[in-house]
């Protein structure tokens, strides 16, 4: 089953409709010593622990907006919902390596500008597969690498609208899904702003 990840679910209002079959992507940073959800700096937001108690999703994508918060984040996740599946995204290299050594779940990025070789060298649990321009040819190399190494990686696909392209008026997603089918790639999650559209596409 492919789980749909709601992009920037940074407040309690955004949790409506997120059930056990769904997930959320959030931004975490410190604000006067409190761990809060906020994409931009110097603004207040919902405290992470408060948000966690309301969260009913089965997967959490954590975009760490300040370096070195991983221990605090994991401790709060364990204290509220130790069974919650999660992974860190967009970490700087030193903190990514540190997190992997500690056994934390992390993602490596793959796109036109971030190579498959680099992603596999990082030994992460998840791959965050993106396209900034609409060019998805890196999926071919990803498929070949997975076949060659017989390694099962969890994969999250980034929906085109997260990079500013229009989802509703474009056939990019249909072409993308056809390419995924031809390559026999298996995606575990899709991060999107428009879960209802993807629900129909994945039927």
Regions found by a protein language model. Give the residues of each.
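Phosphate-group recognition and catalysis centered on beta-loop-alpha active-site segments
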Residues: 1-203
């Amino acid at each position: 089953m492919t789980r749909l990840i709601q992009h920037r679910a940074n407040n309690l209002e955004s949790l409506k409709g997120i059930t056990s079959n769904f997930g959320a992507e959030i931004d975490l940073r410190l604000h006067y010593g409190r761990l809060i959800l906020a994409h931009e700096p110097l603004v207040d937001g919902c405290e992470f622990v408060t948000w966690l108690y309301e969260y009913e999703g089965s997967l959490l994508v954590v975009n760490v907006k300040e370096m070195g918060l991983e221990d605090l984040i994991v401790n709060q996740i364990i204290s509220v919902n130790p069974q919650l599946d999660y992974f860190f995204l967009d970490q700087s290299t030193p903190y990514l390596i540190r997190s992997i050594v500690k056994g934390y779940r992390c993602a490596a990025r793959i796109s036109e500008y971030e190579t498959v070789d680099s992603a596999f060298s990082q030994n992460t649990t998840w791959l965050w597969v993106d396209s900034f321009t609409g060019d998805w040819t890196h999926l071919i190399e990803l498929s070949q690498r997975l076949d060659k190494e017989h390694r099962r990686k969890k994969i999250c696909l980034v929906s085109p609208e997260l990079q500013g392209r229009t989802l509703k008026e474009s056939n990019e997603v249909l072409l993308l899904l056809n390419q995924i089918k031809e390559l026999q790639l298996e995606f575990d999650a899709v991060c999107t702003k428009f879960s209802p559209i993807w629900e129909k596409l994945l039927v």
